[in-house]
Regions:
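Metal-coordinating catalytic core of metallo-dependent amide/deamination hydrolases
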Residues: 1-13, 20-125
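Alpha-helical structural signal
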Residues: 11, 73, 207, 226-229, ...
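Non-catalytic positions within long, well-ordered alpha-helices that form the structural scaffold/packing
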Residues: 15, 80-81, 109, 132, ...
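Divalent metal-coordination and catalytic microenvironments
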Residues: 18, 25, 87, 118, ...
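Structural motif
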Residues: 20-21, 48-50, 85-88, 137-138, ...
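Active-site-adjacent C-terminal substructures of enzyme catalytic domains
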Residues: 114, 124-240, 254-258, 264, ...
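A generic structural signal for residues embedded in beta-strands
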Residues: 249-252, 281
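Short peripheral tails and domain-boundary helices/loops at the edges of structured domains
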Residues: 268-285
Length: 286
């Protein structure tokens, strides 16, 4: 009950910040029971659930990473797959290497899950190339990219999902979005809301940081936070206002969308609609 209450509290924060579609990952249980429990709760509230049993290597498996990979791809996957749409892995230094990550993602694919990946957050490595190899919907973070990484992303269907809240919270260097846009990479922006490295549900904050520190124009930031996010989930029903798409939108109490970057930290969400129905309306004085 406590876990679900916390989930709903964060969901309400997201709605108030203008978010209508979100992905929820596991990865903080790291046991069969706790990973399955967290996904089962998330699946009650969003269709975009991601099995991330391979988030980090638990202390009990510190010198036995391959044993943990076997658990993740065996009993844990079997138990969690019914509650998940996606499979994810943290492919980076101190977590899982490229070969281990490939095994984990391929096991998920074999169970009918769609792949995505945490890649190149802490250091350059082979995560982005693996994402392209396996046609991952998204490579999250993409902080440390080589020219060949950018070229590979540009020629693929994999979205580079940038997470400014993580760099802000950890005082890390920001990725250079200008290089990605110049190469024709599809870019998404997301909050990366998690208690370890980016405990924010504010999309407007992430947009402001992306504009200030990552080289986004206001137009690029808005597109990446909407259509880019939809493409990172391979959704065609959300992300824009167009005939045949869901009427999901946020109405701002501002003269221009540019104020999302111009006035960081200011609540400018007046109303939020999902499928044409109001799910949040700002009340003055509340």
């Amino acid at each position: 009950a406590e876990l679900e209450a916390n989930f709903l509290s964060l969901q309400n924060e997201m709605i108030r910040s203008g978010i209508t579609t979100f992905e929820s990952k596991s990865g903080y249980g790291l046991s069969v029971k706790d990973e399955a429990r967290s996904l089962a709760i998330a699946a009650k509230h969003t269709s975009e659930t991601t099995f991330l049993g391979a988030h980090v290597v638990p202390e009990d498996y510190a010198d036995k990473t391959d044993e943990y990979v076997a658990l993740v791809t065996g009993e844990m996957l079997e138990t969690c797959a019914p509650h998940a749409k996606w499979v994810d892995v943290f492919c980076d230094v101190g977590a899982f290497d490229v070969d281990q990550s490939r095994v984990i993602l391929q096991a998920g694919i074999a169970k009918g899950l769609k792949p995505r990946i945490h890649a190149n957050q802490l250091a350059a490595g082979g995560g982005v190339q693996l994402a392209v190899e396996l046609d991952c919907a998204s490579a999250d973070h993409c902080t440390h990219l080589s020219a060949s990484d950018i070229e590979a992303l540009a020629g693929s269907n994999t979205v580079a999902t940038l997470l400014p809240g993580a760099e802000f919270s950890t005082r890390a260097n920001y990725p250079d979005a200008k290089k990605l846009f110049a190469a024709g990479v599809t870019v998404a922006l997301a909050t990366d809301c998690n208690p370890g490295s980016s405990y924010t549900t504010s999309m407007s904050f992430c947009i402001a940081v992306a504009i200030r520190d990552m080289g986004f124009s206001p137009e690029q930031a808005i597109w990446s936070a909407t259509m880019g996010g939809a493409k990172a989930l391979r959704r065609t029903d959300v992300g824009a206002l167009s005939v045949g798409m869901s009427a999901d939108l946020s109405i701002l109490s501002a003269p221009s969308f540019r104020h999302l970057g111009y006035r960081p930290g200011v609540d400018q969400i007046s109303q939020v609609l999902k499928s044409g129905k109001t799910i949040y309306k700002h009340q003055d004085g509340n």
